[in-house]
A protein has these predicted regions:
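Nucleotide-state-sensitive switch-loop elements of NTP-binding domains
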Residues: 2-10, 14-15, 19-124
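Long, charged, low-complexity intrinsically disordered regions
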Residues: 2-6, 160-167
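G-domain G4 guanine-recognition motif of GTPases
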Residues: 11-12, 41-42, 115-119, 139-159, ...
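Short, aromatic/basic amphipathic alpha-helical patches
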Residues: 49-56, 154-163
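Arginine/glycine-rich "motif VI" loop of SF2 helicases in the C-terminal RecA-like domain
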Residues: 107, 135, 165
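Flexible active-site lid/hinge loop adjacent to a nucleotide/diphosphate
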Residues: 121-136
């Protein structure tokens, strides 16, 4: 089997993952005619507007339960849809090791993007420090949205640097 790149989008509910994914699937710089499997682990297919996708090559599949994330289940989806790349909108309440251990061996995380609401992130980091750190540890890119003039960017940057030692 060929290696399959996985674009992993992590962050808490309301952070803007769905909108970001919707926009990249409408972007000619990202999209090709290759089939994409979009695994939606938070929300539902109705959160997306396929008519805005650049191509009609996106297959959406909802994963409602973390227990469903198994190598067998994901392999079945791959065999059924034969994608060339995979996008995962990951549930912010689920721990990342669940998806890492569930990915078939030939799947690899090509890019891990953490999207965070700059207004809610400090509250989440205090209320759920381990879960917040889990989302940041392996992130290749951390995007803070909804920033305002009053946003204390240095506080957000300090938290990311503390947790994500590779960045």
């Amino acid at each position: 089997m060929n290696d399959l790149p996985v674009y992993l989008f992590v962050g808490f509910m309301g952070a803007g993952k769905t909108r970001f994914i919707q926009e990249i699937l409408a972007d000619a710089d990202f999209c090709t005619s290759d089939k994409v499997l979009l695994l939606i682990c938070e929300g539902s297919e109705s959160d997306y507007n396929p008519s805005l996708f650049l191509h009609d090559n996106v297959v959406m599949h909802c994963v409602k339960n973390e227990r469903d994330l198994t190598p067998e289940y994901l392999s079945t989806l791959e065999e059924k849809h034969n994608p060339k790349r995979i996008i995962v909108e990951y549930n912010g309440a689920w721990w990342l090791p669940a998806i890492y251990s569930a990915m078939p061996k030939h799947w690899f995380v090509f890019q891990n993007l953490c999207i965070a609401n700059s207004i809610e992130f400090p509250l989440n980091a205090v209320a759920m420090p381990d879960l917040s750190s889990d989302k940041l540890e392996d992130a290749d890119i951390v995007l803070f949205n909804r920033c305002q003039d009053s946003t204390k960017k240095h506080v957000l940057q300090a938290f990311v640097r503390k947790v994500n030692t590779d960045g």
